[in-house]
Amino acid sequence: SCWKWYHPPVFQKKSKQIINKESSIDGVRDYLRNAVDRQMLADVPVGAFLSGGLDSSAIVSFAREKDKDIRCFTIEAQGEKEKGTTDDLQYARRVAKHLNVSLDVVQISSTKMASDIELMVKTLDEPIADPAALNVLYISQLAREQGIKVLLSGAGGDDLFTGYRRHYALMTEHWWTWLPIKIRNTLCNVSSKLNQNNLLGRRVTKLFSGANLEGDERLVNYFSWIQRDDLKK
C-alpha cells in the first residue's frame, strides 16, 4: 500500500477577482444548498439535529427542499440552568414551526448525564470536557429507535462563520491592543480579581487574561481552557 500526507486545498485568490456582498451571500447559499443536497442522497431515512441556531436551521431549511417530511431532533435540559446560558428548545420549536417540520424533543437531566460521563470518556478518542457529546448520543439513540440512521448536523458552523466568543474577542482588540504593555499588564491583573462565579466576570477575565501577550500567543490563549500558570502547578 502507499501512504501519502493529506494536504487540504488552499484558496488561491485571483489578483483581479472582485466579489461584492451580494455575490458572496449568493455563493455561500449555493454551496451550502449543494452540500446538503449531496448528504441527502441515502438509502435510509435522513433526519437532522435542530438547535434553532443559524447553522442547523439553514441546513434543515435546505434539507426540507428535498424531503418535506424530514424529522428533526433537539435537546431539552431539565433542571436549573446556569445564569447567562440559553435554552435552545424555544428557538428550535420556532424554526420547526416556521419550516413546518416535525420536532422530537429528548429530555435529559443532570443525573442522567453524570451517570454517562464514563461512557463518554471511553467512547471518545481524546480528552474532551464538553458534555455536548452526550447530547449527540441521546438524540442519535432516539433517532435510531425511530428508524433514522443518518442525521445532518450543523457542527463546525461556528468555526466557519466565526460564531464563537473568541472570534468576538479578536474583534475587540483594536480598542485596546495599542495600549502600552504596562497598562495591558494592569488590565490582566485587575480582570483576574473579578468574581469568577459570575458569567460576565469570567468572560472579562478570559478576554484580558492574555492582554500582556503578543500576537499569536494571545490568539492561542483565547482557544485555551486552562491557563499556563495553572498547568505548572
Stretches with model-predicted labels:
Residues 1:
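Active-site-adjacent helix-turn-beta-strand microarchitecture at beta-sheet edges
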